Amino acid sequence: MATIPTLKTDRLCLRQFQSSDAPEVQRLAGVKEVAAGTFLPHPYPDGTAEQWIASQQEEFDADTLVNFAIVLLAHDILIGLIGLAIVAEHEHARMSYWLGMPYWNHGYATEAVQAVLAYGFNQRELHRIYAPHFLSNPASGRVLQKVGMTYEGRMREHYRRFGKFVEVELYGILEQDFHR
């Protein structure tokens, strides 16, 4: 059984989720504004975070998913999640992330995305990483632009969220472009 690595940036530690993180995951993810920009359920059911955290090592061992807890280094406070859903056969991954509302607009998402791109290309030897975001969440699009990802298009009414079809914008980056 391999261990989910720990990544560090200037302000963040990206580490494996621990069972003790469950209450904070539930608190942060349970905010409707956070759920609206993600696929998190709302309301966030009791017990969901515990079950989800318990499944993470198995997914990592299957080489299909790696999720990191985003933690503020200075205060050891969990602020969100970032992960890669990996398709090993095609050497690509879908990146997803979310932050608790108090941590929006501080550059944390950009810092975490940059670290996970480096991990994906340098350690996992991926060829491509892409990230969709809901059109209604333009801040995520700005994060992806800042790290050098290329806008690849819009998928109209691609997902159903809170009873409505929503549009998704897609960004991607190739390994060779990341290392330029």
Named regions from a protein language model:
Residues M1-A35, N67, V71-R180:
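Acyl-donor (CoA/ACP) binding surface of acyl/acetyltransferases
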Residues E58-D63, M149:
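Short loop/turn motifs at secondary-structure junctions and domain boundaries
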Residues S55, E59, Y119:
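Solvent-exposed, charged/polar functional surfaces in cytosolic regulatory/catalytic domains
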Residues A29, T38, F60-D61:
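Hydrophobic residues in alpha-helical segments
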Residues E33-S55, V66:
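Conserved GNAT-fold acetyl-CoA-binding loop/helix
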